[in-house]
Regions:
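Beta-propeller blade termini and top-face loops
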Residues: 1-257
Length: 257
């Protein structure tokens, strides 16, 4: 059914590809990826489709980013296949048994919002921001340590690719960590250097969070959690750092705080 593997999004994320050398082998994708080895023919109560990925890697399944759109099977070696999704390109050389990202050193993300910390906020202050390195889908962190001013630290909400936190190291290349999965929406950094925190949100007003950086390790508090569609998909929000108040577009004709 539509709700099974596309979860109501078949207008957006739906692909199918048959192996040109063996049409009994086929791949379908919605949110995640599935493969059949018998042409999708059910035998009794058994499911002819095997799930080969999960959008954040759970239940023993390997990670492949959500929302599948396309795939290409090699005309020379049908074991080799590329999958295109909202996270870029994923590759397998054994019919999807093992998948790996092919986006290393490519920065193709699109920012909805971005928030920058005051340049002196982390002067003489060290803190570790925990998160996930999405290039390998493993836990990672950003360590901020500076004995002088002008540390560039920012956070931003990305289309389909979470909320990324990053800090500079002079002219050296740095990598961001994802601090909130799914779609990244509003991001707001406190402009009070004596109160180090930032605000993030998922879509609508579903997961508004505050991340405290005053200690030596980041700590996250959920300010609002709901399953509704109050506000816009990428809703307008703003932070008054002086009062510690978040304002949000929450419903037609009204604003909540």
């Amino acid at each position: 059914s539509d709700d099974d593997f596309t979860r109501g999004q078949s207008f957006y994320d739906l692909m199918i590809k048959a192996d040109p050398a063996n049409p009994n082998v086929a791949y379908v994708g919605g949110i995640d990826l599935f493969r059949t080895d018998n042409g999708g023919n059910a035998s009794g109560s058994s499911n002819p489709w095997t799930q080969i990925s999960h959008w954040y890697g759970m239940s023993g399944l390997q990670f492949a980013h959500a929302d599948q759109h396309s795939s290409v099977i090699s005309s020379v070696d049908a074991n080799k296949i590329l999958f295109g999704n909202d996270g870029g390109i994923f590759y397998s050389n054994n019919q999807g048994t093992n998948l790996g990202s092919r986006n290393y050193n490519y920065h193709t993300s699109q920012y909805y919002t971005i928030a920058v910390a005051p340049s002196t906020m982390f002067e003489n202050h060290s803190v570790t921001q925990r998160g996930t390195d999405r290039s390998v889908n493993r836990s990672s962190s950003v360590f901020i340590s500076r004995t002088g001013p002008n540390q560039d630290v920012f956070v931003g909400g990305l289309q389909d690719n979470g909320t990324m936190f990053q800090a500079d190291r002079g002219n050296a290349k740095t990598r961001a960590v994802d601090v909130s999965g799914g779609d990244g929406a509003a991001s707001m950094f406190s402009q009070n250097v004596n109160n180090k925190y930032y605000i993030t949100n998922y879509v609508y007003n579903r997961a508004v969070e505050a991340v405290n950086l005053n200690g030596d390790t980041s700590r996250t508090w959920r300010l609002n959690s709901e399953g509704s569609t109050n506000g816009d998909f990428i809703t307008v929000q703003d932070l008054d750092s002086n009062r510690g108040v978040v304002y949000s577009n929450y419903r037609s004709g009204g604003t909540n705080r």
